[in-house]
């Protein structure tokens, strides 16, 4: 009784793990028999209490969490705001998906954490609570689904469905929720059936690998150890203790001068506590990895036997124990978890919160603005940033680590606990990322615009795939395509006034407009619209409107002045220079179109690239038709791969290079009608001219009708030509689809006269028996092998320096036999003449691979000229000159302060009159005299150059002006290339407001604005805008780009712009809900078409946001239909942590399969190590150390990975079991081919120790590298063929062994079992008999020590105050990567 009084009384909840510990202590102290008696009493007590409680479970026991309602409401509110942002174009689809998933994930997690406290407070004896938290049935996440919310589910592909299931199973699901939740339900049912067999097979393979490992010696004499440090923060204390208990020290441990533990001493709980309290230096322990033999293990490297708490006995079959103990919990592991699905784990970042209210300050030069992955604006800091928060009485300093996002602005007031920064999740956490492509489809049809320069993807110069350089909007301007031929095109927008006559406009009026076909963008110019009144368009010149059909962007200019010239239109990186004067234009209605110069984005031309092209008007067709090649050898320029890869992308245009002389064009009339339209003619019928085809379309030619149904439309073709019903004797009936040259044809015996032109013969079979032949007229085009350059350019152009050459090459734009389709009555260009740039390589001095081109703007004496300059570059050097600040030759508007305002981020240099100093040819693009206008090439490298600001003196000025006025657009181009235009009568009632309103009013006072403008006769136009003669009775011309010059009437200016900062400009894109006037209406999103004194006309458009690196499909100005792919985003998402979990994960690690294509593949890491170390250390040492290091590294990481999976499921396995198995996987090396040795064959797998020993014995380097074998491969690569054959592939293994004459020494357990011998383990182990005296003395010592260590432990039998054995593994454990072994300590 006296003894009992000394015992400490404990009163706490005890769970499974704690009971295990209790039992092991009891056995240590009292022995087996006594312990079993105690446990019987515990069992009886347990059943008795359970009977008395009588737990039953009903639906009423499922109590919903009260806070759920407002949590869900809050999340819905956030999603709604997000949806709005997406609609306004502030956030793109990927950001929206990410954010909504994180919103719901956080809500669901929060509910889950609320659940436990809620039960504890309201109903601690709730059966659901008791069951799940005692571990009897169900786990937290299942209970969460019953009483919280089911949360996010994943679809069968493992992708998230961003519609969360808000209800729980207690409330019941709606139909949609039920269907979504069925995706994941199947897995749970299948799991249980499959799980047992999987776990069994895993156990079998594990045992197979390690069955021969038996404890054969007491000490192998190794001096190695693996060091573990108690100071290491990455490892929780509990895991540290688990790692140490039961191990044997590899080295003495000193505390200052005093030795507190000696080598080969095994570690008990007392020693561990001492280590922790003393915070000793790193502790070196022996593990199965350090044991010096491969086929067995020694007692000291293994440590204590878990069964009876003593050093393991000799002859113990520890291999099989290890295999069993890893395989057995496999049945408890889930195969997959079905509750969270593929949540973006690792997606939520850590936050830094503000410690108190106050103003926040930081150095703005250390951060730069960016977007977070949710599309919010933020600052990114590269280095540690110290942030000061000043509250009234105290100043806080917060340091923000590098690569974090700062979510607040400088000098902003922050509340206490407000999130001020987001720390990027560290890269060390092994979140496997995968790259996902997401396509965004357009939901309306219309014309595509983008508000930034979109770069071409370099490989596909001729395709329509573009890469975005920076964040910008893509706009789909609404408007359908109406392809009728009677109504030429609808010139009317909603609410335009309209004359009744205008519908019956004759087609000539349109053909008389000069047409310029610039890649699907058709601009119609006419020199003077008022002349055309006779033609029946009476009303447009009176309207002062810009008429813009939604789809085709036909732009009309009303009453331009006679002397104004239409100048270089600029489109992304292409210029068109008109070549003839206006007088010519009036004589010849179809003018020659301009030469377009194409410059790549970076301005670098490779050899043989196309510099410019010219569309010859002789190869223009009005009608649709089919193109056939004659004697042309054509080869496609676009490589095959490009075409194949982008087959999904629409409208891929190939160019064919022409070798020879002629091709043919077979005209036909084509109408593309919507599906619903009723067609009044039958297929294969013959109609005359002007027949009604549908309600409002009449045919223009007579002939045969073919009707073809396409996906969303009907294509109706009318073939003109003669129809012949051939007799039986006619040979022509056999020819179908051939061209017949003139002079040969006998189409009919009656008409034997010779044909004048080529004809095309086509055989048509309306029914099976009848057929006839259609003879169609053909237009023949001859192609000169190269137009003489002199016809295109003046001769003085070619003063070639550095052997620059230009060749003229013709390209056919359509393939052989391809149908050529025109939209409306625009003409179609069949052949394009290109200038190909080349240069000589002969000079050794000019080993030039590429040339640089720039558009250069020169202003001389208030005249501004543009030049194209080509530089031969040898190196990538980039010289830029800083222009002089005070430049006397500044023209009026561009005063020396104003010049850098026009395009704030690029500066121009001025060349004064002293042009003669520069060598090289300079020719102006636009001479003022109308006769000669020429293209310029400067080919000297000592000219001048424009570059973006890097270190320019007035950098700060611009920075400040940006702060004052955020309206400045930052252009991403090679600098402003503008054109000069003469202005006749400039009225002074206009204000000319540039981008930067503030700076204008600062530099030119408004009162003297008027006279400035009267003086100037020329002024600069920005590259993106054009200002034409702005007198009030003419229209303001719409340009598809933002006009950077705003014309506002005086009163209009007051109404709108003083109150708000928004200035409406023509062509500007406006997002939805931008407030223009103080109490004006909220606008829909769109493009401003017309600005009048009191009104604005906006064409509706839908913005899509795209971030850098996204791929844009389609061309600028191209017509897109509903459902076409607009953009493809490539984004990284973390692999959801629980798609492969549990068993499959363990199996993946043990079989060494790569986890994902972009995983941190261990084998690759291993190879890298080997190569690097060999390079550093030379051959023999390199291989030895390289293989050693790799193996050590990969072993530690494998053990950690496997432990992580088991711990996350709450299963405790001792590290040493996993170590024994990992040791077998990593114990082989692969002989490599370098430095062939005579001993082993290349590609042979040998044991690491054997390789080392052989290397030492031969004194010759054996080249090998470490390799990870999976458990299956390791079982088939053992020393015993009998064991291999009994595992898998019996016939193959036995046949090979017979061929090689292998000998099996019957060392393992399995071979002996198969052959019925004595098993070499336990009592059958021979070594048990000879047990030397030295060993016995060691045994006795260790026994004594153990007794000493265990003595004082009964008093804290329910564990000391640290609650070491806290069974409930915290959630965090799942996420922290435990580095159980810190390094290799080779003492």
Curated annotation (Swiss-Prot):
Cofactor binding description: Binds 1 Zn(2+) ion per subunit.
Gene Ontology cellular component annotations, sorted alphabetically: chloroplast; DNA-directed RNA polymerase complex; mitochondrion
Disulfide bonds: none
A GO molecular-function descriptor: DNA-directed RNA polymerase activity
Gene Ontology biological process: DNA-templated transcription
EC number: 2.7.7.6
Top-level division of the source organism's lineage: Eukaryota
InterPro entries: DNA-dir_RpoC2_beta_pp, RNA_pol_beta''_euk, RNA_pol_Rpb1_3_sf, RNA_pol_Rpb1_4, RNA_pol_Rpb1_5, Rpb1_funnel_sf
Annotated SUPFAM superfamilies: beta and beta-prime subunits of DNA dependent RNA-polymerase
Record keywords, A-Z: Chloroplast, DNA-directed RNA polymerase, Metal-binding, Nucleotidyltransferase, Plastid, Transcription, Transferase, Zinc
Record has Zinc as a keyword: yes
Any one Pfam family match given in the protein's UniProt record, by short name: RNA_pol_Rpb1_4
Compartment list: Plastid, Chloroplast
Catalytic activity line of the entry: RNA(n) + a ribonucleoside 5'-triphosphate = RNA(n+1) + diphosphate
Coarse class of the protein's main subcellular location: plastid
Known cofactor(s): Zn(2+)
Subunit note: In plastids the minimal PEP RNA polymerase catalytic core is composed of four subunits: alpha, beta, beta', and beta''. When a (nuclear-encoded) sigma factor is associated with the core the holoenzyme is formed, which can initiate transcription.
Function, in words: DNA-dependent RNA polymerase catalyzes the transcription of DNA into RNA using the four ribonucleoside triphosphates as substrates.
NCBIfam families associated with the record: rpoC2_cyan
Family statement: Belongs to the RNA polymerase beta' chain family. RpoC2 subfamily.
Protein name listed in UniProt: DNA-directed RNA polymerase subunit beta''
């Amino acid at each position: 009784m006296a003894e009992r009084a000394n015992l400490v009384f404990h009163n706490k909840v005890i769970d499974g793990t704690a009971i295990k510990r209790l039992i092991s202590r009891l056995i240590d102290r009292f022995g087996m028999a006594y312990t079993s008696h105690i446990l019987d009493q515990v069992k009886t007590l347990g059943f008795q209490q359970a009977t008395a409680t009588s737990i039953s479970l009903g639906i009423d026991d499922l109590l919903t969490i009260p806070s759920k309602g407002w949590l869900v409401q809050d999340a819905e509110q956030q999603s709604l705001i997000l949806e709005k942002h997406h609609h306004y174009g502030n956030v793109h689809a990927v950001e929206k998906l990410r954010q909504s998933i994180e919103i719901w994930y956080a809500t669901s997690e929060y509910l889950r954490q609320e659940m436990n406290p809620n039960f504890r407070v309201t109903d601690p004896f709730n059966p659901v609570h008791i069951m799940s938290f005692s571990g009897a049935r169900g786990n937290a996440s299942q209970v969460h689904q019953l009483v919280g919310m089911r949360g996010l589910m994943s679809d069968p592909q493992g992708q998230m469905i961003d519609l969360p299931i808000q209800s729980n199973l207690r409330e019941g699901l709606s139909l949609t929720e039920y269907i979504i939740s069925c995706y994941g339900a199947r897995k749970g049912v299948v799991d249980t059936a499959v799980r047992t067999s999987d776990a069994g097979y895993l156990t079998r393979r594990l045992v197979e690998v390690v069955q021969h490992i038996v404890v054969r010696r007491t000490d192998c004499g190794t001096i190695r150890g693996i060091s573990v440090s108690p100071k290491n923060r990455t490892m929780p204390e509990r895991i540290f203790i688990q790692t140490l208990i039961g191990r044997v020290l590899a080295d003495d441990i000193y505390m200052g001068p005093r030795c507190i533990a000696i080598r080969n001493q095994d570690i008990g709980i007392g020693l561990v506590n001492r280590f922790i309290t003393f915070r000793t230096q790193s502790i070196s322990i022996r593990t199965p990895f350090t044991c010096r033999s491969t086929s067995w293990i020694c007692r000291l490297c293994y440590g204590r036997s878990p069964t009876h708490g003593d050093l393991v006995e000799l002859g113990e079959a520890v291999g099989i124990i290890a295999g069993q103990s890893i395989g057995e919990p496999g049945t408890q592991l889930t195969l997959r978890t079905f509750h969270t699905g593929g949540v973006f784990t690792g997606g939520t970042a850590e936050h830094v919160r503000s410690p108190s209210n106050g103003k926040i300050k930081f150095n703005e030069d250390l951060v730069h603005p960016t977007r977070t992955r949710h599309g919010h604006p933020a600052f990114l800091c590269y280095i540690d940033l110290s942030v000061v928060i000043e509250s009234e009485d105290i100043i806080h300093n917060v340091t923000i680590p590098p690569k974090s996002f700062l979510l607040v602005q400088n000098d902003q007031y922050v509340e206490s606990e407000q999130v001020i920064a987001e720390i990027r999740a560290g890269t060390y956490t092994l979140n496997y990322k995968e790259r996902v492509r997401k396509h965004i489809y357009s939901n309306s049809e219309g014309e595509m615009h983008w508000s930034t320069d979109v770069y071409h993807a370099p490989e596909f110069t001729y395709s329509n795939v573009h890469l975005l350089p920076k964040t910008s909007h893509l706009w789909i301007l609404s408007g359908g395509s109406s392809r009728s031929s009677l109504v030429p095109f609808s010139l009317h927008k909603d609410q335009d006034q309209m004359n009744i006559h205008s519908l019956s406009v004759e087609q000539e009026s349109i053909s008389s407009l000069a047409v310029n076909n610039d890649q699907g963008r058709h601009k119609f110019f006419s020199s003077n619209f008022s002349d055309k009144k006779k033609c029946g368009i009476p009303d447009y010149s009176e309207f002062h409107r810009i008429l813009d059909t939604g789809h085709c962007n036909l732009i009309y200019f009303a009453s331009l002045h006679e002397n104004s010239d239409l100048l270089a239109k600029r489109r992304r990186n292409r210029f068109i220079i008109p070549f003839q004067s206006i007088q010519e234009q009036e004589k010849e209605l179809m003018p020659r179109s301009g030469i377009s110069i194409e410059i790549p984005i970076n301005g670098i031309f490779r050899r043989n690239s196309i510099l410019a092209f010219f569309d010859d008007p002789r190869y223009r067709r009005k009608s649709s038709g089919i193109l056939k090649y004659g004697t042309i050898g054509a080869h496609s320029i676009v490589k095959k791969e490009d075409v194949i890869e982008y087959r999904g992308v629409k409208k891929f245009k190939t160019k064919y290079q022409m070798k020879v002389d002629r091709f043919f064009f077979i005209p036909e009339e084509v109408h593309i009608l919507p599906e619903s339209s009723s067609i009044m003619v039958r297929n294969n019928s013959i109609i005359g001219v002007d027949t009604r085809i549908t309600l409002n379309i009449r045919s223009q030619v007579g002939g045969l009708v073919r009707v073809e149904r396409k996906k969303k439309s009907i294509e109706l073709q009318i073939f003109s030509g003669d129809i012949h019903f051939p007799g039986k004797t006619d040979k022509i009936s056999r020819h179908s689809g051939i061209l017949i040259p003139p002079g040969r044809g006998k189409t009919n015996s009656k008409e034997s006269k010779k044909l004048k032109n080529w004809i095309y013969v086509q055989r048509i079979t309306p029914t099976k028996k009848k057929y006839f032949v259609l003879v169609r007229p053909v237009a023949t085009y001859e192609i000169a092998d190269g137009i003489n350059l002199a016809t295109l350019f003046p001769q003085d152009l070619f003063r070639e320096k550095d052997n620059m050459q230009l060749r003229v090459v013709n390209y056919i734009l359509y393939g052989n036999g391809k149908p050529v389709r025109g939209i409306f009555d625009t003409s179609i260009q069949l052949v394009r003449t290109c200038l190909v740039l080349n240069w000589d390589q002969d000079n050794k001095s000019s080993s030039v691979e590429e040339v640089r081109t720039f558009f250069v703007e020169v202003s001389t004496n208030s005249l501004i000229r543009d030049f194209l300059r080509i530089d031969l570059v040898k190196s990538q050097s980039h010289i830029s000159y800083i222009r002089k600040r005070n430049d006397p030759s500044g023209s009026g508007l561009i005063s020396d302060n104003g010049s850098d305002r026009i395009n704030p981020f690029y500066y121009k240099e001025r060349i004064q009159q002293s042009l003669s100093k520069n060598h090289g040819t300079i020719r102006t693009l636009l001479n003022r005299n109308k006769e000669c206008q020429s293209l310029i090439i400067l080919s000297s490298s000592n000219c001048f150059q424009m570059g973006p600001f890097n270190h320019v003196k007035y950098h700060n000025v611009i920075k400040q002006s940006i702060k004052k006025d955020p309206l400045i657009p930052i252009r991403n181009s090679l600098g402003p290339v503008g054109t000069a235009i003469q202005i006749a009568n400039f009225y002074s009632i206009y204000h000319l407001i540039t981008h930067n309103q503030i700076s204008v009013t600062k530099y030119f006072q408004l009162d003297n604005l008027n006279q400035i403008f009267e003086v100037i006769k020329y002024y600069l136009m920005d590259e993106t805008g054009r200002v034409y003669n702005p007198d009030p009775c003419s229209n303001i011309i719409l340009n598809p780009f933002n006009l950077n010059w705003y014309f506002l009437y005086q009163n209009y200016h007051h109404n709108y712009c003083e109150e708000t900062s928004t200035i409406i400009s023509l062509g500007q894109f406006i997002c939805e809900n931008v407030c223009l006037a103080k109490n004006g209406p909220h606008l829909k999103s769109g493009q401003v078409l017309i600005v009048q004194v009191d009104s604005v006309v906006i064409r509706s458009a839908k913005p899509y946001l795209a971030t850098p690196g996204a791929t844009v499909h389609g061309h600028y100005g191209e017509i897109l239909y509903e459902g076409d792919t607009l953009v493809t985003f490539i984004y990284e998402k973390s692999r959801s942590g629980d798609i492969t979990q549990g068993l499959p994960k363990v199996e993946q690690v043990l079989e060494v399969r790569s986890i994902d294509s972009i995983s941190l593949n261990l084998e690759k890491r291993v190879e890298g190590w080997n190569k690097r170390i060999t390079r550093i250390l030379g051959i023999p040492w390199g291989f030895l150390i390289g293989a050693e290091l790799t193996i050590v590294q990969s072993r530690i990481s494998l053990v950690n990975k496997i432990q992580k999976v088991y711990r996350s499921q709450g299963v405790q396995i001792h590290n040493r079991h996993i170590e024994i198995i990992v040791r077998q996987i990593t114990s082989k090396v692969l002989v490599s081919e370098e430095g062939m040795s005579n001993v082993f064959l290349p590609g042979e797998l040998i044991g690491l120790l054997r390789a080392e020993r052989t290397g030492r014995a031969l004194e010759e380097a054996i080249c090998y590298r470490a390799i990870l074998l999976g458990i299956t491969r390791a079982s088939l690569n053992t020393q015993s063929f009998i064991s291999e054959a009994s595992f898998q592939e019996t016939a193959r293994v036995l046949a090979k062994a017979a061929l090689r004459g292998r000998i099996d020494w019957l060392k393992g357990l399995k071979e002996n079992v198969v052959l019925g011998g004595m098993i070499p383990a336990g009592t059958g182990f021979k070594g048990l008999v000879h047990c030397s005296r030295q060993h016995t003395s060691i045994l006795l010592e260790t026994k004594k020590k153990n007794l000493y260590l265990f003595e004082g432990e009964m008093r804290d039998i329910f564990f000391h105050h640290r609650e070491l054995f806290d069974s409930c593994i915290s959630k965090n454990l799942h996420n922290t990567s435990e580095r159980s072994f810190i390094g290799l300590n080779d003492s």
